[in-house]
Each structure stands twice: as structure tokens, then as C-alpha cells.
Swiss-Prot record:
This is 4-hydroxy-3-methylbut-2-en-1-yl diphosphate synthase (flavodoxin). It comes from Brevibacillus brevis (strain 47 / JCM 6285 / NBRC 100599). It is an enzyme of class 1 (oxidoreductase). Belongs to the IspG family. HAMAP family: IspG (MF_00159). NCBIfam families: ispG_gcpE, PRK00366.1. [4Fe-4S] cluster binds at C265, C268, C300, E307. Its cofactor is [4Fe-4S] cluster. It comes from the Bacteria. It catalyses: (2E)-4-hydroxy-3-methylbut-2-enyl diphosphate + oxidized [flavodoxin] + H2O + 2 H(+) = 2-C-methyl-D-erythritol 2,4-cyclic diphosphate + reduced [flavodoxin]. Its EC number is 1.17.7.3. The keyword Iron applies. The keyword 4Fe-4S applies.
Length: 360
């Protein structure tokens, strides 16, 4: 089985996928790609919360041509999502796209596929083969009875073979399913076939709540096996929420440790402060920081500092007041109305010791 450190490095613009321990976070815009300003505004929002690569829907030639203007001002590398029409891929490449998402077996004749491959080769643009449970060919459904992990992998390998026959190996592969166990098994099987980097995700995961859970279980399980080089959390929600979930998945697995994490107790009858409101406010305030920081927001002073002694900094509520602590040691007592501001002072002090960035 090829682990992420053993996969073939592929470059999307200046971002490396594969051949390393780190995992790249992606998303996809919801704006009409032809609307350049709206698309750029969405890309900027995604960039600001930690997205590293963004995909655009290319539904016609106007969208493909709009890529040129978007590319000129985009802070992120761009991926063109293309289905069936090889001309759109060629126009996107001429417009400066950084990566193409196609299935070679679905864009027409061998000659059309070869034209796209040669255009990608000239520009050193990778191709992502994107197979999911809904795109498995009828012959494979007849063979396996349903979109099984084996069927999805065989479908992907058929597309891979087309590119390999053209001596093209600048490839990324995704094999998504809306069924989490199927998705996990599929990536495990694929990791035994080739050392191409894998794009991991649960397709059609659902709304923000249910989709976040399905994606966390599916993506998290695959990543915990050492498999997966880039991820996209698919949610029926603002794409910014996809990035937040993706970052927490990576942080929870210690794949990245340069982002803050907020831990908070579930509250109980001893809690005498607005714990939920405070924890949410703190999480929002530290979300844009790029420092390894663990912040604890605890509901009471009975065992708050002790339970959160591994945190760098935190608060423990009391009756109209609370304790500020660092590394499990109490620093001072403050009024409840001052808890957030005093905690942010401590956080800024820690941040300033590492880099000149402030929040609050």
C-alpha cells in the first residue's frame, strides 16, 4: 500500500500534492464561473480561511475563457471541472488553468483525449481522474451488481490506463462515494494499485451538520491509514464551512499543527457562565491564526484548569467570574464580562512570541 509520503509528487500551480506528510485542502466555488468578480470574491474568502486549491465549474466556452481573467487575480491555483467536452479542456488550458478534472474515457475519441493530454504535457498541468459511485459504467455495474469498491477502482484504472498508454503520469485520482464504508474500502484498494496521489472525499455528503459528520468519519478514517494527499469536504453549505471542517479533520489527526484548536467542556449543572457563547466567540476569533495553539474554554473552576492542563491558555468559568490560566496554572481571576477580552490578551501575548499577528 502506498502511503502519502510515497506517492508521486504533483504540482498544481505552486502547490505540491503527494510525496509528503502534509495534506492539501481544496474546495469548489458555487458562483457561475462566467461571473468573474463574484467568483474572485468567493475564491478570496476561501483563501482567507485556509483553502489551498479551488475548483471551478466549466460548463461552456464562456466559462472556460473567463478563467484567464480569474487566473490573473486569483490567490489560489485553479482547477477546471470538465465533463464530456474536450474543447472546454483545451480552452481552459489556453486560459492558464493549473489542473484539469476530467475522465479521459468520457471526452470522446482517442484523438480528442490525446489532444488534451498533449496540451497538458506542454504546460505541465496535471489531470485529476474523478470517479464516483454515480459515474461507474454500466458494464461494471453489470459485472459487480452495484457500485462496489471494486467497481469504482476498476473504473478509475480504466481511465488511468488511457493516460498511461499515452505516456502521461501527471495524475491525481479521486474515487468518491456517498456511502462512507464503500468510500473507505475504495481508497484502501486504490492505494494498492498505483502511487498516484489521491484526492479524498465523500461525495454528496449532505448538509452542514450531517455532511460534516460523514466527511469527518470517511476522510478521517482514510487519512488515519496514511492514505490521501489532498481532501475536499463536500457540503451543501457555504464553501467556507468546508474549509473549517477540513482544517479540523487534519488538526484532529495531528497532520497539521500550525492552526489553533479550541477545546471546551460539554457543560453541566455547575456551569454559571454562557459557555456556548464564549466558546463560539473564541473559536471564531482564533480561526484565522496560523500558530500551533490549544485554547481551553471550561465551564467551571472546580476542575477546569486541571482537565485542560495540556492547553496553552484557557478560561474556567465561575459565578459571575472566571479564571484565566496558562499551561494549567491560574494567572488571574476576572469578571465574567471580561473573560473574552482577558483571554484574547493572553492569546495575543502567546502569538506575539511566535509571530507578529494579533486578533480580537
Amino acid at each position: 500500500m502506498f502511503k502519502r509520503e510515497e506517492t508521486k509528487p504533483v504540482f498544481v500551480g505552486g502547490v505540491q500534492i503527494g510525496g509528503q506528510k502534509s495534506v492539501v485542502i481544496q474546495s469548489m466555488t458555487t458562483a457561475d464561473t462566467r461571473d468573474v468578480e463574484k467568483t474572485l470574491a468567493e475564491i478570496q474568502r476561501l483563501h482567507d480561511v485556509g483553502c489551498q486549491i479551488v475548483r471551478l465549474a466549466v460548463i461552456n466556452e464562456d466559462a472556460a475563457r473567463a478563467i484567464k481573467k480569474i487566473k490573473e487575480r486569483s490567490p489560489l491555483p485553479l482547477v477546471a471541472d470538465i465533463h464530456f467536452d474536450h474543447k472546454l479542456a483545451l480552452i481552459a488550458l489556453e486560459s492558464g488553468i493549473d489542473k484539469i478534472r476530467i475522465n479521459p474515457g468520457n471526452i470522446g475519441s482517442k484523438e480528442k483525449t490525446q489532444r488534451v493530454v498533449e496540451a497538458c504535457r506542454e504546460r505541465n498541468v496535471p489531470i485529476r481522474i474523478g470517479v464516483n459511485s454515480g459515474s461507474v459504467e454500466k458494464r461494471l455495474l453489470d459485472k459487480y451488481g452495484y457500485p462496489s469498491p471494486e467497481a469504482i477502482v476498476e473504473s478509475a484504472m480504466d481511465h488511468v490506463q488511457i493516460l498511461e498508454d499515452l505516456n502521461y503520469d501527471n495524475i491525481v485520482i479521486s474515487l468518491k462515494s456517498s456511502d462512507v464504508p464503500t468510500m473507505i474500502q475504495t481508497y484502501s484498494l486504490m492505494a494498492q494499485k498505483r502511487n498516484y496521489p489521491l484526492h479524498v472525499g465523500v461525495t454528496e455528503a449532505g448538509t452542514q451538520f450531517s455532511g460534516s459528520i460523514k466527511s469527518s468519519v470517511g476522510i478521517g478514517t482514510v487519512l488515519s491509514m496514511g492514505i490521501g494527499d489532498t481532501i475536499r469536504v463536500s457540503l451543501t453549505a457555504d464553501p467556507v464551512e468546508e474549509i473549517k471542517v477540513a482544517k479540523q479533520i487534519l488538526r484532529s489527526l495531528d497532520i497539521v499543527n500550525n492552526d489553533p484548536v479550541v477545546i471546551a467542556c460539554p457543560s453541566c449543572g455547575r456551569c454559571a457562565i454562557d459557555l456556548i457563547g464564549l466558546a463560539t466567540k473564541v473559536e471564531d476569533a482564533v480561526s484565522t491564526l496560523k500558530v500551533p495553539l490549544k485554547v481551553a474554554v471550561m465551564g467551571c473552576a472546580v476542575n477546569g484548569p486541571g482537565e485542560a492542563r495540556e492547553a496553552d491558555v484557557g478560561v474556567a468559568g465561575g459565578n459571575g467570574e472566571g479564571l484565566i490560566f496558562r499551561n494549567g496554572e491560574i494567572v488571574r481571576k476576572v469578571k465574567e464580562t471580561e473573560l473574552f477580552e482577558e483571554l484574547m490578551k493572553e492569546i495575543n501575548e502567546i502569538v506575539n512570541e511566535q509571530k507578529p499577528t494579533t486578533v480580537g
